[in-house]
Amino acid sequence: MGGQVSASNSFSRLHCRNANEDWMSALCPRLWDVPLHHLSIPGSHDTMTYCLNKKSPISHEESRLLQLLNKALPCITRPVVLKWSVTQALDVTEQLDAGVRYLDLRIAHMLEGSEKNLHFVHMVYTTALVEDTLTEISEWLERHPREVVILACRNFEGLSEDLHEYLVACIKNIFGDMLCPRGEVPTLRQLWSRGQQVIVSYEDESSLRRHHELWPGVPYWWGNRVKTEALIRYLETMKSCGRPGGLFVAGINLTENLQYVLAHPSESLEKMTLPNLPRLSAWVREQCPGPGSRCTNIIAGDFIGADGFVSDVIALNQKLLWC
């Protein structure tokens, strides 16, 4: 495959690397018996976009207009698409080292691709293959036996039933006994006692029926907002409606629209996001995990490592000790 595109290094890639590498095992023992859906867990939105392929076709799920523009004016369309598609700069191992424990994996099969090669996708496809990435995650977990990850497998563009079966077989072969089968949301102590480290949510109903190792899709509160205050209002509205019963994600990721892109031709998603991180981080620090109807659980963001987001989310668990 061709070269990859990544976010610029306009922020320190070392901001929170390694400091939170083993944060779950370092939690106060009182929190080891709290179910995962009542803990505060940092996540990354569109985890794999650090390795988008400059030469890949536009995703077939994108609009017909974008497909036509890419064919007619590729030298203009492609750079614009790429700079608004990248949401992460750290690779998956660096994200795990930084403390991220929810990975948002948008999986696809390119029509032009090899029969069994699955990629990740966000408007364009990644250089990374799914099987290689899952292996990388498994190897990281072997080095961190008391850390737990939630892998949200979704999108599934171009996947036939046979490819779903192939993907699930890869998941089982790679993670083996690390997989926590579907059931009540476990605590860290329960997972540790069973040697389990991986919860796989899988947004395909037929696959769920066939494989008890897979969990239903984790709800994601996606605000689809350009402005920070509008996104925060959306999240507060969702909280007022009551949290879901199990694992769920509050996404603090801003989202561009066509009007914004046309009005800001020199910008990118990174340039739009970074100046707004202080306000988003302030909102994060106000949250509280737990069973209450307005409590948060997983909080996912863009450009992990750009600020203290991961540490802020982890620190919310201290509020559970005040109850």
From Swiss-Prot:
It holds the Pfam family PI-PLC-X. This is PI-PLC X domain-containing protein 1. InterPro entries: PI-PLC_domain, PLC-like_Pdiesterase_TIM-brl, PLCXD1/2/3, PLipase_C_PInositol-sp_X_dom. One of its GO terms (cellular component) is cytoplasm. GO terms for biological process: lipid metabolic process. It is found in: Cytoplasm. The keyword Plastid does not apply. The lineage of its organism: Eukaryota, Metazoa, Chordata, Craniata, Vertebrata. Residues 30-206 form the PI-PLC X-box domain. CDD domains: PI-PLCXD1c. The gene coding for this protein is located in the pseudoautosomal region 1 (PAR1) of X and Y chromosomes. It comes from Homo sapiens. Keywords: Cytoplasm. Widely expressed. One of its GO terms (molecular function) is phosphoric diester hydrolase activity.
